[in-house]
């Protein structure tokens, strides 16, 4: 018989840097999950990624207090800010541009994100990422 699901927990944790402090500890502790076991498993799974990049994770907690988790790719906004070399997007994206990204940078981000996007092919994924860039106040070259 399948295990009964008790809860889904969605968090953003920095790759390779999960520890029992907030937000991880309180979110898992209230469901009775072994926090250190999650931290070790998460850090092992994300060790190939660039340390410090926020990584969305969905944790499924079962009624016997066991868990499974699935990691997603880093949010597009974080990757775009890194590519453009900025710390935050524009408060007025239509009138005030804060940086520029090229088609090559968009393609690199789209390849990273393609598994999590609903785009049919790489070109559609690039257009999706370009739209995110424009809404952050970035100029998009070559699209």
Curated annotation (Swiss-Prot):
Specify the superkingdom.
Bacteria
User: How is the polypeptide modified once translated?
Assistant: One or more lysine residues are methylated.
Q: Which gene encodes it?
A: rplK
Record bears the keyword Ribonucleoprotein: yes
This chain's protein is named Large ribosomal subunit protein uL11
Q: Which GO terms describe its biological process?
A: translation
Q: Which SMART domains match?
A: RL11 (SM00649)
Report any Pfam family annotated for this entry.
Ribosomal_L11
- UniProt subunit comment: Part of the ribosomal stalk of the 50S ribosomal subunit. Interacts with L10 and the large rRNA to form the base of the stalk. L10 forms an elongated spine to which L12 dimers bind in a sequential fashion forming a multimeric L10(L12)X complex.
Name a single GO cellular component. Answer: cytosolic large ribosomal subunit
Q: What does this protein do?
A: Forms part of the ribosomal stalk which helps the ribosome interact with GTP-bound translation factors.
Keyword Cytoplasm present in the record's keywords: the answer is no
PANTHER family found in the cross-reference section: 60S RIBOSOMAL PROTEIN L12 (PTHR11661), LARGE RIBOSOMAL SUBUNIT PROTEIN UL11M (PTHR11661:SF1)
Q: Which family is it part of?
A: Belongs to the universal ribosomal protein uL11 family.
- Please name every pair of cysteines joined by a disulfide bond in this record: none
Q: What GO MF annotations does this protein's record show?
A: large ribosomal subunit rRNA binding; structural constituent of ribosome
What are the entry keywords? Methylation, Ribonucleoprotein, Ribosomal protein, RNA-binding, rRNA-binding
